[in-house]
Amino acid sequence: MLIYGTGGHALEILDELKELNVPKVFFFNDLDEKLDEFYGHQVFHSIRGVKEYLSDHFPFVIGIGSPNLRCAKHQEMEGFGGIPMSVISSKLDLGTYNLHLGKGLNLMSGVQISSEVRIGDGCLINRNANIHHGARIGDFCEIAPNAVLLGNVEIGHQTFIGAGAIVLPGIKIGNNCVIGAGSVVTKDLASNSIVKGNPAK
């Protein structure tokens, strides 16, 4: 498995892969050619090196935050022949009925996802986030630690929900939005909205 990135989130992904007993893990960082090893694992600096050592169609996971960056790097890796893989923690709670999970996800430890939930491609659902029944989350969103999406919430693509934020039932949030940490979203938000506070505005 190739993890894109060598920062804090990449380290958390490494923890999850260790828990899942993934035998061989490598990292990719094309910005720091002096970094040859990350916590005992080889770091590649070019796609050519990855393909020579692994294969033309290498499995990868995005180990960085930020919805727009995750989207760009996911598409870049796919363009090079990479196969997006999901990292799904062994310590999370998934609903039983009509659950749709996209490709290339990071579902971290402590996450709770109810039944009738749809999560698009490339999303990061961070530690202890709680997603209730009927929620719909678009592609490449980031749901930060301890955020709560209540029943039938709809989130567009590449939207960021900050740590500890709460989105009330039935709320619709557009694409490319940013919801500040600890906010309470009480009304629908158009695409490209940036809000914070209680109520969020």
Language-model region placement:
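Hydrophobic, well-ordered beta-alpha structural blocks that scaffold small-molecule cofactor pockets
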Residues: M1-L54
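Cofactor-binding loop segments of dinucleotide-utilizing enzymes, especially the Rossmann-like FAD-
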Residues: T6, N29-D30, G65, S89, ...
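Short alpha-helical
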Residues: G8-H9, N68-L69, H100, V184
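Short amphipathic alpha-helical segments
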Residues: L14-E16, A72-E76, I119, S191
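Conserved acidic residues
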Residues: V25, F58-P59, K103
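Phosphate-bearing ligand-interacting subdomains
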Residues: K34-D93
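Structural signal for interior beta-strand "rungs" in well-ordered beta-sheet cores
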Residues: V87-K196, A200-K201
